[in-house]
UniProtKB/Swiss-Prot annotation:
Keyword annotations from UniProtKB, A to Z: Glycoprotein, Glycosidase, Hydrolase, Phosphoprotein, Secreted, Signal
Function: Alpha-L-fucosidase is responsible for hydrolyzing the alpha-1,6-linked fucose joined to the reducing-end N-acetylglucosamine of the carbohydrate moieties of glycoproteins.
UniProt signal peptide: 1-26
Organism, as annotated: Pongo abelii (Sumatran orangutan)
GO BP annotation list: fucose metabolic process; glycoside catabolic process
SMART domains in alphabetical order: Alpha_L_fucos
Alphabetical list of InterPro entries matching this protein: FUC_metazoa-typ, Fucosidase_C, Glyco_hydro_29, Glyco_hydro_29_CS, Glyco_hydro_b, Glycoside_hydrolase_SF
Location within or outside the cell: Secreted
Glycosylation sites: N169, N237, N375
Protein name: Plasma alpha-L-fucosidase
PROSITE patterns xref list: ALPHA_L_FUCOSIDASE (PS00385)
EC number(s) from the headed UniProt entry: 3.2.1.51
Chief site of localization: secreted
Length: 465
C-alpha cells in the first residue's frame, strides 16, 4: 500500500471495523440431545422421501473369491460350511488366509465416472457404497485400519473419494455410505465381547474414530449403519455420535440415517427403518422405511457361479419398486461389482432397464405420497400413489388386460371433473363409473411397439376420491 492511499481508505476501513462480524454457518434451530427420545424427534430431511429409489453397492475383498456370499470369510472360517471349505481346498494352497485376498483386490478396471453414468441412467436418486463391511477392510485410507484398507492394500486408491467426486460432479444423486460397526475377527472386538461388552476398547479406538473420519472427509448424506455384533447402542455410543451428526457435522441439515445402531434399535430408533433385509410388508407403515434388497437372490456381493435364474427379472424389480413406494417406502436395490471394479452386464442391464421405465413412469414414483388405498381390491397387481396438491392419483398396473379394459375398485370418479391419462401416451382416456365403487378405463389399442414402456404402466387420475 502506498502512503498517499491512506486517507482515501481510512473511512471504509473504519466502517468495516464498526460492522458486526459475519454470521457463523447456519446450524439447525433444533439442538438434539444424545438420547433416543430427542434424536427420534428429528424430522427426516424431505429429499429422502422424495427420492424413492437408490442403489446399494456391495464391494470389497469378498469380491475376490466371489463365491457363495459376501459372508465368505465367516462361512469358511467360523461356520466351516462344507462348500466354502471345499472351494478353498480346490482353489488355494493350504496356507492361504483370508487376508491374502487383500492384494488380489486390484480394482484394475474401476472407473468411478463410468459407475456414476450408469447410476444416473438407472433413475436412482441416491447411492450407498459399502465403505467397510464386517471383515474390516475399508475402501478409503482409514487411519484406524492400518494395512487393511484400499490405500495400503489392493487398489492403492481411495475408492470412496473417487466415487464421491464422480457422483457429485456428474450426477444429481446423493452420495451415501454403508458402515459396519463391528468386525467379525478384530481382536479388540472379540475381547470386548468376552467381557459382555463392559469393555469398550473397539468402539473407542476403531468404530467411532472411523465414523467421524468418514463424515468429515466424505460428507455422506446417507449414513447406513449395520452390524452391531450383538452389542447394545450404549456400547457403540450411538446416541452421542448421532447427536454430533445432527448438531455439528458438515451434513447436519441433509443427512439421513437408518435404524441399525445397536442390538434392539431396529424398527425402534433412527431416521428411517430398514426392519430386516429385503423387507417388503405390502402394507402401510407409520414410519418412513426402506426396502433394501438385492438383484442377485442369493448374495449381496458378486458371485461368479451365479446363473441367470439367480437374478431378479426387470418385471420383478419394477414390481418391488411399485409395491414399496405405494406403501410409503424407498427401494434400495443392490448390485455387486467384480474384483476388477466392473459392473457386470446383467447388473448394468437391470439398472438401465429401470431407468428407461422411470423415464416414462417416474411421475408416479418420485415425490409422491401414499394414497388412502395402497393396492386395488378388484384387479390384482394395481398399486396407488398420489400427489394431493395436484389432485392426482396414480394407478400403476403391472399386467396389461387382454380385454383392453382396466377395472379399478378404489377410485370414485367425479362427473365432469375426473380425467384419466396413460403416462407416456398423453391423450385422455374414456372411462365409466361402476355401479357401486370404482371406474372402468378403456385403455388405448396399441401395438407392442407403440406401448410407452414395458413391464408396467401408470394411469394419472385427476380429481378422484
Amino acid at each position: 500500500m502506498r502512503p498517499q492511499e491512506l486517507p482515501r481508505l481510512a473511512f471504509p476501513l473504519l466502517l468495516l471495523l464498526l460492522l458486526p462480524p459475519p454470521p457463523c454457518p447456519a446450524h439447525s434451530a433444533t439442538r438434539f440431545d444424545p438420547t433416543w427420545e430427542s434424536l427420534d424427534a428429528r424430522q427426516l430431511p424431505a429429499w429422502f422421501d422424495q427420492a424413492k429409489f437408490g442403489i446399494f453397492i456391495h464391494w470389497g475383498v469378498f469380491s475376490v473369491p466371489s463365491f457363495g456370499s459376501e459372508w465368505f470369510w465367516w462361512y469358511w472360517q467360523k461356520e466351516k460350511i462344507p462348500k466354502y471349505v471345499e472351494f478353498m481346498k480346490d482353489n488355494y494352497p493350504p496356507s492361504f488366509k483370508y487376508e491374502d485376498f487383500g492384494p488380489l483386490f486390484t480394482a484394475k478396471f474401476f472407473n468411478a465416472n463410468q459407475w456414476a453414468d450408469i447410476f444416473q441412467a438407472s433413475g436412482a436418486k441416491y447411492i450407498v457404497l459399502t465403505s467397510k463391511h464386517h471383515k474390516g477392510f475399508t475402501l478409503w485410507g482409514s487411519e484406524y485400519s492400518w494395512n487393511w484398507n484400499a490405500i495400503d492394500e489392493g487398489p492403492k486408491r481411495d475408492i470412496v473419494k473417487e466415487l464421491e467426486v464422480a457422483i457429485r460432479n456428474r450426477t444429481d444423486l446423493r452420495f451415501g455410505l454403508y458402515y459396519s460397526l463391528f468386525e467379525w475377527f478384530h481382536p479388540l472386538f472379540l475381547e470386548d465381547e468376552s467381557s459382555s461388552f463392559h469393555k469398550r476398547q473397539f468402539p473407542v479406538s476403531k468404530t467411532l474414530p472411523e465414523l467421524y473420519e468418514l463424515v468429515n472427509n466424505y460428507q455422506p448424506e446417507v449414513l447406513w449403519s449395520d452390524g452391531d455384533g450383538g452389542a447394545p447402542d450404549q456400547y457403540w455410543n450411538s446416541t452421542g455420535f448421532l447427536a454430533w451428526l445432527y448438531n455439528e457435522s458438515p451434513v447436519r441439515e441433509t443427512v439421513v440415517t437408518n435404524d441399525r445402531w445397536g442390538a434392539g434399535s431396529i424398527y425402534k430408533h433412527g431416521g428411517f427403518y430398514t426392519c430386516s433385509d429385503r423387507y417388503n410388508p405390502g402394507h402401510l407403515l407409520p414410519h418412513k422405511w426402506e426396502n433394501c434388497m438385492t438383484i442377485d437372490k442369493l448374495s449381496w456381493g458378486y458371485r461368479r457361479e451365479a446363473g441367470i435364474s439367480d437374478y431378479l427379472t426387470i418385471e420383478e424389480l419394477v414390481k418391488q419398486l411399485v409395491e414399496t413406494v405405494s406403501c410409503g417406502g424407498n427401494l434400495l436395490m443392490n448390485i455387486g461389482p467384480t474384483l476388477d471394479g466392473t459392473i457386470s452386464v446383467v447388473f448394468e442391464e437391470r439398472l438401465r432397464q429401470m431407468g428407461s421405465w422411470l423415464k416414462v413412469n417416474g411421475e408416479a414414483i418420485y415425490e409422491t405420497h401414499t394414497w388412502q388405498s395402497q393396492n386395488d381390491t378388484v384387479t390384482p397387481d394395481v398399486w396407488y400413489t398420489s400427489k394431493p396438491k395436484e389432485k392426482l392419483v396414480y394407478a400403476i398396473f403391472l399386467k396389461w388386460p387382454t380385454s383392453g379394459q382396466l377395472f379399478l375398485g378404489q377410485p370414485k370418479a367425479i362427473l365432469g371433473a375426473t380425467e384419466v391419462k396413460l403416462l407416456g401416451h398423453g391423450q385422455p382416456l374414456n372411462w365409466i363409473s361402476l355401479e357401486r365403487n370404482g371406474i372402468m378405463v378403456e385403455l388405448p389399442q396399441l401395438t407392442i411397439h407403440q406401448m410407452p414402456c414395458k413391464w408396467g404402466w401408470a394411469l394419472a387420475l385427476t380429481n378422484v376420491i
